[in-house]
Amino acid sequence: MITDKNDKINKIIVKIKNKLLILGFHSLNLILIIFYLYPGSLFGCYLYNNCNIQPQITGNFIVSFNYSIASNHFYVFFILSALGIFAYQNTKKIKFIIIYLLLLSIILELLHIIIPLRAFEWGDLFGNILGVIFVIIIYKIKGKYVQN
């Protein structure tokens, strides 16, 4: 009797957790698209009263003297991908989500070519893609070694 009640409570908790993950993924996805397509930096406008300045969470990841990978882009796409992949991990939509995240990471950066006050940068693109790929690797490792 008690275990039946505990099972029901655990199922409800899992459903709520999944709903919150899905809501978080879609909310962050919408916010990311708005921030990416805005001409200039909304954070720069707010923090520095200058829409041309992009705040940095940490310094970029340096690959060589001439090249770096944008850390901000890595962090944002890592978080978005983690929410999306782990929200949909036990559904038929997981492959779609992975493809969507990879395409989103590429398309949003390519759109900077035509958006005023924005510029396409290879380091940003690689930061986006690496954020997604790192979460995919974590998801694959989790699936191999951890029982749901």
Label the model's feature ranges.
Residues 2-125, 129, 133-146:
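Bulky hydrophobic segments
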